[in-house]
Design a protein with these regions (language model features):
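Metal-dependent nuclease catalytic regions and adjoining charged, substrate-binding loops involved
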Residues: 60, 69, 73-152
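Catalytic cores of nuclease domains that cleave nucleic-acid phosphodiester backbones
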Residues: 1-56, 78-82
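A short acidic, glycine-rich active-site loop
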Residues: 54-64
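Short, glycine/acidic-rich beta->alpha junctions
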Residues: 18-19, 62-66
Length: 152
């Protein structure tokens, strides 16, 4: 592994064609030119056991799609993205675990956001649970929450 040239923290992204803005936790730019993205996820012991324990729960791809979206933005900005990783931190024990995410999620996230944009062309669509937003708690951050609440 080559040496780190630069580290970007809370790096802003803006993808107008996807109507997506956000911040990447960590972007590591290596002397070799390689670029790696890290998204830090904090979780309690129950979530940690669910994700890493013996009886691992069903995987959810929303975190992978989020990283893929970040990868798309970095690839557009810098011309490349060489690695995606979740850094999971157990806030109860301070344990950490790195989970690599396949670079195919860059294209999957692009396809996901393209589909959302296509659905939105005729106004705000009635999206199914698990599409967009993927998780119910994400609604509180959405600019259109009141419209969804009003439609039932």
């Amino acid at each position: 592994m080559s040496d780190v040239k630069d580290i970007l923290i809370e790096h802003p992204i803006d993808i107008p064609e996807m109507n997506v803005k956000g911040f990447i936790d960590v972007v590591a730019i290596m002397e070799s030119g390689e670029i790696f993205i890290y998204d830090i996820k904090t979780m309690g012991s129950w979530s940690w056991r669910f994700k890493f324990g013996r009886g691992k729960g069903n995987p959810s791809i929303h975190q992978e799609l989020q990283l893929g979206t970040y990868g798309y933005a970095i690839r557009e900005e810098f011309g490349r993205c060489d690695g995606l990783s979740l850094i999971c931190y157990n806030k109860d024990t301070s344990d950490m675990h790195e989970v690599g995410v396949d670079l195919d999620f860059i294209d999957q996230s692009y396809n996901f956001w393209t589909r959302v944009q296509d659905l939105q062309k005729n106004g705000m669509p009635m999206l199914q649970d698990g599409e967009c937003p993927v998780m119910d708690w994400e609604c509180k951050y959405c600019n259109y929450k009141e419209l969804c609440d009003a439609r039932g």
